[in-house]
A protein has these predicted regions:
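CheY-like receiver
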Residues: 114-132
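Acidic, metal-coordinating helix/loop segments flanking the phosphotransfer/catalytic sites
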Residues: 17, 30-47, 55
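Two-component/phosphorelay signaling modules centered on CheY-like receiver
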Residues: 10-29
């Protein structure tokens, strides 16, 4: 699975990348702002894990919506889930940070199943799924 990480905290992004790569996924890019995230779409993205508050401000919700429109499966990961209100149409949901390694693993398994129409595993327990 080709994953885009949209996260401006470098150490958090690297932790997520390590978990995903250990599971055999390819991290196509780590984007710390909207411009980098838009550039990464051209690399082919199956799934995006998107923070809300990035280097250029509260641009995560808009980037998530753009990624959904481009065909990516999107899950938000943020310390401020309330900022999403009812959610972003087409996105899977939001996982509150801090996120443990096991939650990243569960999230990736869940997102892969959603993306590729596989048997649905149990979602991460703290995932707030959007209903649209």
């Amino acid at each position: 699975m080709r994953v885009l990480i949209v996260e401006d905290e470098w150490l958090v992004a690297l932790e997520i990348q390590n978990v995903l790569e250990d599971l055999g996924h390819t991290v196509v890019a780590i984007a710390a702002d909207a411009r980098k995230a838009r550039e990464a779409v051209a690399m082919g993205v199956d799934v995006a894990l998107v923070d809300l508050n990035l280097r250029d401000g509260l641009t995560g919700p808009g980037i998530g919506a753009e990624l959904v429109r481009s065909g990516a499966t999107v899950m938000f990961m943020t310390a401020n889930p309330g900022q999403l209100g009812a959610g972003v149409p087409g996105a899977i949901g939001v996982l509150p940070k801090p996120v443990e390694h096991e939650e990243v693993k569960q999230a990736s398994i869940y997102l892969e199943a959603v993306r590729f129409g596989q048997a649905m595993p149990k979602p991460p327990s703290r995932l707030r799924e959007f209903t649209h």
